[in-house]
Amino acid sequence: MFKLVSYIILSWVLVCLAQPDVSVVASVVSCICGYSLLWAGLFALVEQLSWKKVWCIAFIWTWTVEGAHFSWMLEDLYVGTSIYFVWGILLSYLATLFASFSCLVVWCCRKQYRGALVWLPGVWVAIEAIRYYGLLSGVSFDFIGWPLTATAYGRQFGSFFGWAGQSFLVIAANICCFAVCLLKHSFSKGLWLTLCAFPYLLGGAHYEYLKKHFSDSEVLRVAIVQPGYSPHMHAGRTASAIWRGLVSLCQTIQTPVDVIVFPEVSVPFGLHRQAYTLHENQPVLESLLPNKSWGEFFTNLDWIQAIAERYQCTVIMGMERWENKGGILHLYNAAECVSREGEITSYDKRILVPGGEYIPGGKIGFSLCQTFFPEFALPFQRLPGEFSGVVNITERIKAGISICYEETFGYAIRPYKRQQADILVNLTNDGWYPRSRLPLVHFYHGMLRNQELGIPCIRACRTGVSAAVDSLGRIVGILPWESRTCPVSTGVLQVSVPLYSYHTVYARLGDAPLLLIAVCSVIGAIAYFYRKKKETPPQTFF
């Protein structure tokens, strides 16, 4: 019994630590045997416990592992204690899926349904696709294959098959490791070693080839502004004070610069509201543009155009956009791109955050929210955007804009490659969960798009991580971010980002190949079990 428990505990420790921002070693080891140790322990426990109890053990194991992975959600300073309920529901949902899948793997081995094991990696991709595409706005964080991205070679494997391919390989390798423990066949061992090495060999060969041909002959000169204010600090300041702080940061920018990027919802009031007076802001305006004449009242657009004129560049800034539709006021989370000539291009966030930006469940969901969680009942309706966010930064350079956690969804960002974006730009605010792991977790998930699509990215975040990353996933520049050991900091990251890009399989085909495999796997598994049901049940192991 001690040996069985030690297997389960060891697997728990490995998988808990298997996060690219926590441990690279644990991430690599977990990809090849972390889950197989759990299944080996459950396999032996079936002889002593009922299937119901085995499922409960798998559920508790997964719930606690996911609890560690999503521990950043428990920073309730700004979001309130109601987040514990959301956290618990999310963990229970994920634990139900993986506990059921784990019992299916063990059951197939107990029944000697070895042929079914071939279909199970694809079945898992189908299960994970449900939460990736179907749960509210989608849960893109912490997919099974994420630990594979802890190394440059593992991330580069994503340029072929994306998140689904990474999850498929991790599950396949662990099933083979489980089979090696049970069958001790040389074929199983050889297949396991092949699956373990395959993503690193393929990704590594591609990575080294691209690194050899990498060129920085064409660059984009960017200035990324990190204001360093949390939601609490933002609420305690006037809009004019916020602008004075932003202009003060911009004073450190050296020309020439092609684009200045500010974070998500950097200032209140939207683009066109006349919320500022000349009397209150005249000293700052004169320091920005000494010879420009201003009216008595002016807008956020006037501020942005002044910065664009001062630095002779494009300015991208996140802010809210209000629109009256049929007498009902709607709110968009928007990015405004203003060229140095004054041309305005807007992008509205398409993937909204459940609870924070909309209440799931329509009128019923809103009614329940008002009853049980009145602090989360939104006084207005937020709408998702309908169009992609490719904008012109210069005459020759295009950027694909995303806001907040949109950048973690490959299917949402992939069209930017087809629309000939040269660089990805993300505006975000991770300050809602202060002193947590979220800034790094979000950053590591978002930068996967670089190698999936073969283009660089820049991201501006209020409290970090603000960074520039090239198309091979290498960090070109980064500012300090808020964590338990590092306080909130302000700054401007000014760097030249190489625009070297390359074609990828994922950019061309997306998730379609693996989703097709997933559908075929589900059909194949059902057909296999149906056929076996008609046969005499075989004897179990031992």
From Swiss-Prot:
GO terms for cellular component: plasma membrane. The chain crosses the membrane at residues 24-44, 54-74, 85-105, 116-136, 160-180, 190-210, 509-529. Residues 220-499 form the CN hydrolase domain. PROSITE patterns: CN_HYDROLASE. Keywords: Acyltransferase, Cell inner membrane, Cell membrane, Membrane, Transferase, Transmembrane, Transmembrane helix. InterPro entries: Apolipo_AcylTrfase (IPR004563), C-N_Hydrolase (IPR003010), C-N_Hydrolase_sf (IPR036526), LNT_N (IPR045378). Its EC number is 2.3.1.269. The keyword Cytoplasm does not apply. It comes from the Bacteria. SUPFAM superfamilies: Carbon-nitrogen hydrolase (SSF56317). Its main location: membrane. The active site is at E264 (proton acceptor), K349, C404 (nucleophile). It is a multi-pass membrane protein. Belongs to the CN hydrolase family. Apolipoprotein N-acyltransferase subfamily. Catalyzes the phospholipid dependent N-acylation of the N-terminal cysteine of apolipoprotein, the last step in lipoprotein maturation. This is Apolipoprotein N-acyltransferase. It comes from Chlamydia trachomatis serovar D (strain ATCC VR-885 / DSM 19411 / UW-3/Cx).
